[in-house]
């Protein structure tokens, strides 16, 4: 059956030529990102448990995880958490299959704790966190969906979007957070995982505002704090040169008041310890960014089941489509993908698969169009590959 693939030329100013561009990334220790990470870790653990015990992934969604902030008293050289952070794993899961009882809550709690151990290295899971789990049972009609066809049918009438390639600013914002935590943090453990990077490009000038929760026990005094944030600033300025020749100004923790020594200190590396709650889907989209200059879906990707939940599959799929089009069709300057499902219809037959393309100057759009159609059709023909990639942990959701 032929697919409804529509590729059109987009008569719009390319992102790099627009005057104003805004890009944001919430770091992995931001309360919203922690919620995303927990939800996705639980979903993947349930997938593995279902495959191990039942031979197939069963219905579940864990995309309602919530974090209620605790209370802390950070200080140079130490500090303590006075009231634990409350983390509630919420969702639906299949708890029995063909007579086999499944320990879904135990699997979820273990997955959540393992995720925190790997990502929040200064958080004491015995003292700093109360972990709770409330998983209801999936409705029988939705559970049946998983058994009907080789190609799953859509759980809802919904859409997913994706774009490529990343702009210079998008690359800078994304890699600033990633490199600070995966590279500089190994030499400067005071850098907390709770970080927000906000990028503004105004013509040829880029401003990066970084809010980074520093960990007090690794910092002796205010002078040490100032030296560390200055080293971070220099690091980011140098990093940015790998992605742009534009002028880049870096600002770190602009809310600090150095005269009163009121600075952004934490005990655990996240503001969830003191007044900042978190929820799934309030942060980064599945490409790791928040991009108001680009089309975005408001769907939370993390925690949704990777079999037939369109809010997950089509957002991840459209992003992979866009990236592959850029790789395989070099004449494309910008591409925007939109996939729309119909409830109970096969997910490899979207109601529409739309691609809007800005070709590079002097390029034949008809050539670009035909090559883009091939990429889109190929991905839809292999749509369950997205499910496999998710379960193996090969795709990020935030």
Curated annotation (Swiss-Prot):
Pathway: Amino-acid biosynthesis; S-adenosyl-L-methionine biosynthesis; S-adenosyl-L-methionine from L-methionine: step 1/1. It catalyses: L-methionine + ATP + H2O = S-adenosyl-L-methionine + phosphate + diphosphate. Catalyzes the formation of S-adenosylmethionine from methionine and ATP. This is S-adenosylmethionine synthase. HAMAP family: S_AdoMet_synth2 (MF_00136). The lineage of its organism: Archaea, Methanobacteriati, Methanobacteriota, Stenosarchaea group, Methanomicrobia. GO terms for biological process: one-carbon metabolic process; S-adenosylmethionine biosynthetic process. GO terms for molecular function: ATP binding; magnesium ion binding; methionine adenosyltransferase activity. Keywords: ATP-binding, Magnesium, Nucleotide-binding, One-carbon metabolism, Transferase. ATP binds at residues 136-141. It comes from Methanosarcina acetivorans (strain ATCC 35395 / DSM 2834 / JCM 12185 / C2A). Belongs to the AdoMet synthase 2 family. Its cofactor is Mg(2+).
């Amino acid at each position: 059956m032929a697919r409804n693939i529509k590729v059109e030329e987009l008569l719009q100013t390319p992102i790099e030529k627009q005057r104003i561009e805004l890009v944001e990334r919430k770091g992995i220790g931001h309360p919203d990102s922690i919620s995303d990470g927990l939800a996705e870790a639980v979903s993947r653990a349930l997938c593995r448990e279902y495959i191990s015990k039942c031979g197939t992934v069963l219905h579940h969604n864990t995309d309602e995880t919530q974090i209620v902030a605790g209370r802390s008293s950070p200080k140079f050289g130490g500090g303590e958490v006075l009231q634990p952070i409350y983390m509630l794993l919420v969702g639906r899961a299949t708890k029995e299959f063909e007579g086999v009882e499944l320990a879904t809550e135990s699997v979820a709690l273990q997955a959540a704790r393992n995720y925190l151990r790997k990502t929040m290295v200064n958080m004491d899971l015995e003292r700093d966190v109360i972990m709770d789990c409330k998983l209801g049972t999936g409705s029988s009609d939705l559970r049946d969906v998983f058994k009907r066809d080789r190609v799953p049918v859509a759980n809802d009438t919904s859409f997913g979007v994706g774009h490529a390639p990343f702009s210079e600013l998008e690359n800078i914002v994304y890699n600033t957070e990633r490199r600070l935590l995966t590279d500089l943090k190994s030499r400067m453990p005071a850098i907390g995982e709770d970080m927000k990077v906000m990028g503004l490009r105004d013509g040829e000038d880029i401003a990066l505002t970084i809010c980074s929760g520093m960990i007090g026990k690794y910092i002796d005094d205010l002078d040490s704090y100032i030296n560390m944030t200055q080293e971070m600033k220099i690091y980011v300025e140098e990093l940015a040169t790998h992605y742009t020749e534009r002028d880049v100004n870096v600002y770190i923790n602009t809310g600090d008041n150095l005269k009163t020594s009121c600075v952004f200190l934490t005990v655990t590396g996240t503001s969830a310890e003191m007044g900042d709650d978190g929820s799934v889907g309030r942060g980064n989209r599945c490409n790791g960014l928040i991009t108001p200059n680009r089309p975005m879906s408001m769907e939370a990707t993390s925690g949704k089941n990777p079999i037939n939940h369109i809010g997950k599959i089509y957002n991840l799929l459209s992003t992979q489509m866009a990236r592959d089009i850029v790789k395989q069709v070099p004449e494309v300057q910008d591409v925007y993908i939109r996939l729309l499902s119909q409830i109970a219809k096969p997910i490899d037959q979207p109601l529409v698969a739309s691609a809007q393309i800005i070709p590079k100057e002097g390029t034949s759009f008809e050539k670009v169009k035909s090559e883009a159609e091939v990429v889109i059709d190929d991905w839809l023909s292999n749509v369950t590959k997205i499910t496999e990639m998710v379960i193996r942990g090969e795709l990020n959701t935030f």
